[in-house]
């Protein structure tokens, strides 16, 4: 039997209505891509996809990027967020794009995109 938590406890533990869903994203620039192009593309990714959709991106890389996408506020990403990110990466010439399934970012963080 699962333990019953009050609202304060659920908020602290990110459970039930406070659960946060996100997804991992990996992508790669073509070998030899100039650093200026990488910077410009990542800036556009944030300005055109992440911020307008109320998302947050925590990631890093040079030619190969990997990171976590979640909502800026407490909440749950959905399939439309995954598809929007994936489509933008595809239409902007990035390679080896991987977008994970949605997962609980506090309790189910995967070690890699599956």
UniProtKB/Swiss-Prot annotation:
Disulfide bonds: none annotated. GO terms for cellular component: cytosol. It holds the Pfam family YggL_50S_bp. It comes from the Bacteria. Signal peptide: none annotated. To E.coli YggL. This is Uncharacterized protein HI_0341. It comes from Haemophilus influenzae (strain ATCC 51907 / DSM 11121 / KW20 / Rd).
């Amino acid at each position: 039997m699962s333990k019953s938590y009050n609202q304060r406890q659920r908020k602290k533990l990110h459970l039930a209505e406070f659960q946060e869903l996100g997804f991992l994203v990996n992508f790669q620039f073509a070998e030899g891509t100039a650093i200026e192009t990488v910077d410009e593309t990542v800036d556009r990714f944030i300005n055109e996809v992440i911020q307008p959709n109320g998302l947050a991106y925590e990631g890093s890389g040079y030619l190969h990027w990997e990171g976590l996408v979640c909502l800026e506020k407490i909440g749950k990403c959905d399939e439309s967020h995954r598809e929007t990110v994936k489509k933008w990466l595809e239409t902007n010439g990035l390679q080896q794009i991987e977008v994970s399934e949605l997962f609980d970012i506090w309790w189910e963080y995967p070690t890699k995109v599956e």
